[in-house]
Amino acid sequence: MNDIWWQTYGEGNCHLVLLHGWGLNAEVWHCIREELGSHFTLHLVDLPGYGRSSGFGAMTLEEMTAQVAKNAPDQAIWLGWSLGGLVASQMALTHPERVQALVTVASSPCFSAREGWPGIKPEILGGFQQQLSDDFQRTVERFLALQTLGTETARQDARTLKSVVLAQPMPDVEVLNGGLEILKTVDLREALKNVNMPFLRLYGYLDGLVPRKIVPLLDTLWPHSTSQIMAKAAHAPFISHPAAFCQALMTLKSSL
């Protein structure tokens, strides 16, 4: 089995694992790497099948998490953005002793809309899966454009995301399909009631993929967690609002 691409950066006394979202790779953290690197030792990861971690097929959430855990430090803050938030959450469930704190960014324990639960309509996720086989490149670009809609810097932020995708090898259709399948089917709402490490949830007020309506629902479901909504951010707050994003992580670190 191949190894995944993993880079360590920075010299802070606290380890921080950064997990990207669907279709992307670790270059997405480029805009905050310098700032965070002076406070943390960063672990930049390309998830299995993405970017430089080629040679992997589609995986379940559990398989993906197990693969990432092999390379991970004994103790770290785990931060996951979007799909990466599910991987970080699964790590907190399976290896709680190794997760100093859990941070999810523009992520949902259940991305798919269910009865009484806001989310992405399953037929939209299914449509993306269908379109992937028809026009792979265009489907990924559409998904990226959705992530920045509504922000003051939407066009520029979408260009940033596109350049991240193009900077590394594109994932196979099978891998992208597997990622959409995770987004469509996984539901960790009940399971995450049981995590007891510090748990920070960051959201963008304008996010079109993870509706802000889930925030009060999860505040009630997970009273041990803390939530913060960034007023003018959409699905990629670390790109549109890097200073506020980094500040939230420094505040978390100082509380540990």
Curated annotation (Swiss-Prot):
Pfam families: Abhydrolase_1 (PF00561). The active site is at residues 82, 207, 235. Keywords: Biotin biosynthesis, Cytoplasm, Hydrolase, Serine esterase. Substrate binds at residues 22, 82-83, 143-147, 235. It comes from the Bacteria. GO terms for molecular function: pimelyl-[acyl-carrier protein] methyl ester esterase activity. It catalyses: 6-carboxyhexanoyl-[ACP] methyl ester + H2O = 6-carboxyhexanoyl-[ACP] + methanol + H(+). Its EC number is 3.1.1.85. Pathway: Cofactor biosynthesis; biotin biosynthesis. One of its GO terms (biological process) is biotin biosynthetic process. Gene3D superfamilies: alpha/beta hydrolase (3.40.50.1820). InterPro entries: AB_hydrolase_1, AB_hydrolase_fold, BioH, Carboxylesterase_BioH. Monomer. NCBIfam families: bioH, PRK10349.1. HAMAP family: Carboxylester (MF_01260). The physiological role of BioH is to remove the methyl group introduced by BioC when the pimeloyl moiety is complete. It allows to synthesize pimeloyl-ACP via the fatty acid synthetic pathway through the hydrolysis of the ester bonds of pimeloyl-ACP esters. This is Pimeloyl-[acyl-carrier protein] methyl ester esterase. It comes from Salmonella typhimurium (strain LT2 / SGSC1412 / ATCC 700720).
